[in-house]
Amino acid sequence: MSQTIDLTLDGLSCGHCVKRVKESLEQRPDVEQADVSITEAHVTGTASAEQLIETIKQAGYDASVSHPKAKPLAESSIPSEALTAVSEALPAATADDDDSQQLLLSGMSCASCVTRVQNALQSVPGVTQARVNLAERTALVMGSASPQDLVQAVEKAGYGAEAIEDDAKRRERQQETAVATMKRFRWQAIVALAVGIPVMVWGMIGDNMMVTADNRSLWLVIGLITLAVMVFAGGHFYRSAWKSLLNGAATMDTLVALGTGVAWLYSMSVNLWPQWFPMEARHLYYEASAMIIGLINLGHMLEARARQRSSKALEKLLDLTPPTARLVTDEGEKSVPLAEVQPGMLLRLTTGDRVPVDGEITQGEAWLDEAMLTGEPIPQQKGEGDSVHAGTVVQDGSVLFRASAVGSHTTLSRIIRMVRQAQSSKPEIGQLADKISAVFVPVVVVIALVSAAIWYFFGPAPQIVYTLVIATTVLIIACPCALGLATPMSIISGVGRAAEFGVLVRDADALQRASTLDTVVFDKTGTLTEGKPQVVAVKTFADVDEAQALRLAAALEQGSSHPLARAILDKAGDMQLPQVNGFRTLRGLGVSGEAEGHALLLGNQALLNEQQVGTKAIEAEITAQASQGATPVLLAVDGKAVALLAVRDPLRSDSVAALQRLHKAGYRLVMLTGDNPTTANAIAKEAGIDEVIAGVLPDGKAEAIKHLQSEGRQVAMVGDGINDAPALAQADVGIAMGGGSDVAIETAAITLMRHSLMGVADALAISRATLHNMKQNLLGAFIYNSIGIPVAAGILWPFTGTLLNPVVAGAAMALSSITVVSNANRLLRFKPKE
């Protein structure tokens, strides 16, 4: 028997996620229908709630059974048509929709640590999703679990954690930790290398590293000094390895601890009981333990410094908010801390000020630099009634404005939150690295043991020496750290660089999908064009003059919300408009009504044809206007066509240049519009569009996208984020030209903070560059380990008669991580080609 189960969803961030969950549910034979939004699902069928939840989890998201909720006391004031467009996948932001918590982590050294911490956090009751970022040493946790429970779970897994609620405090603590960590690694590297280098040089020049009766006491002192180095400069490796062992796990620190520990124990055994070893096996490796610890600490220090550079983009955003605001009251003006500013307060801005909160100008004019927020390099003129956003700078002028959004609810705060979430996310390509990392260290230990056994039983004499060298070198050269950093470092740098160009990326998956696109579909109105239609010509027929035709058309359009209506009303200006009775909106056709005793029709040719109004006599004029890219709006009075109003929405100033960039990059460009084919083709020709899909109603846009996808195309849809919601959700990547609007920021896979198609070209270029960088890092890490481990195991011995020195292995290990981080940081200097 069929039943409807209501589920609460978590982890969905855009229309693509909604689509994935819906498809996963509908693929089940026991599901008849699945209605999915970004926060909930209503599923009809015979499947149980547990089965549905498991299906959603397999799709990569979380779900729980919903509890009935009371209906709101007041209905939304959003127009019904907007709600219809948005309801499927694009809910507007709410004041309390951010249930995420951020933790600062310590003690993590490689991708194996990430897996352990993530599993520990996800096992806490109330946690719906946990994202651990090795590059930033942070965790982003979604759900209702308390900070204390989260910290305890991380500590129980053998790592450190600190819950941070305030952004400023988080930044301060993160910087303090980073500086302290770099200082610690620096002195540890100096201490270890100060011992290791002289011992190694002396061994190569003045001694042969072999223990004899004459130098036994000296080597014993060197051994004890090396032990002190291992404790003070490398103690963190051994403590971490011990904690991992207690938790039944193994990490990079386990490999370092085993490699250096075995080398030192062997050397000390030879030092204390040389009689137990044959003469040729009395070689000492104290310098190897000290040098390995020194080089790896040096690598960690350089890596930490490079990681700090990768977070610069986010730090720049955090720097945009001033610490104070200038409050205007009846008593005068005074400076108040930003935390005290509340919505409704009146604030003043003067030249050079940075806007503290979002608001609306009530008095004055000013030029504002919004470059850091939107990527728009040209200052914008703002006056009474215009909105201002936190983080922008007053270049010239003075205004009063009323605060509307403060603290975490400003556009800037939401951007920062979105950037941070994107930097903590993982693309599908990163999941391969995670799977390998989960078993990497145990596999390396097994390889080291097997290699050592082979050399012990089948290798040349002295077997014990070769066995030790092989085991130590294999353990030291293996680097799960490079593997773990490969993806997150590229994501942090790529997402941060995109933000500097005014491009907000919802998650890493969006970057990966955007890098594989081959087709870009544009909504026409407001995307390719200015979105401000203008009446460019009025042609009259019969006995109606231009003023009368314009007056009747404007009277009808008073009741319409269509974009063309505003153009006609603007053209009419201050004309006295007659009263209209019986007004009706005819969807996709136009409007009708009665005025001054006449029956009026205003709309496209299809409307007049449907109402049996002859248009044959004016078809030549209709075609002529349409061929010039204008939309012909026809006016009929008492069943007779009397006027044609040519309405044209001009292309954006940078549309042609942006589309040329996309063409050069190899994308096929498609325009999706409700216009008639003649008008649409004229605009497409002017813009440089390859393909036109015309005459499409709003609810048919998603089907048009689906048709393109059925041809095997990877499709991006560029629209305004509200009217194009179904198409944005259907596309492989939805790109909203949101201009900072709530719905656009909170819902799109990619949001452009400025209304410019150059942002589309920038977004796709950065996506390609980021994925390319990510593949370079992963390939480099795989090649390093694929070649390094066999070489360390002695595969070259039969051909060259040489083995890899453990010290060289330690240097290579440190260098591999530094290389990955440095390569990712190249993205911070990436500039899309013009």
UniProtKB/Swiss-Prot annotation:
The UniProt catalytic activity note for this protein reads: Cu(+)(in) + ATP + H2O = Cu(+)(out) + ADP + phosphate + H(+)
Say which species the protein is native to: Escherichia coli (strain K12)
Positions of the catalytic residues: D523 (4-aspartylphosphate intermediate)
What EC number(s) does the entry state? Answer: 7.2.2.8
Let me see what the UniProt entry remarks about domains.
The N-terminal domain (exact residues are not given in the paper) is not required for Cu(+)-binding (when deleted KM for Cu(+) binding is 1.32 uM) nor for ATPase activity, binds 2 Cu(+)/monomer. Contradictory results give a considerable decrease in Cu affinity when residues 1-150 are deleted (KM=31.9 uM for Cu(+)).
Q: Which residues lie on this side of the membrane: Periplasmic?
A: 208-217, 275-283, 459-463, 800
The entry describes its oligomerization and partners as: Copper-exporting P-type ATPase interacts with apo-periplasmic copper chaperone CusF; when CusF is precharged with copper it binds very little CopA. The periplasmic loops of CopA, especially the first half of loop 1, play a large role in binding to CusF.
Q: Which NCBIfam families match?
A: ATPase-IB1_Cu, ATPase-IB_hvy, ATPase_P-type, PRK10671.1
Q: Per its record, how is this protein called by name? A: Copper-exporting P-type ATPase
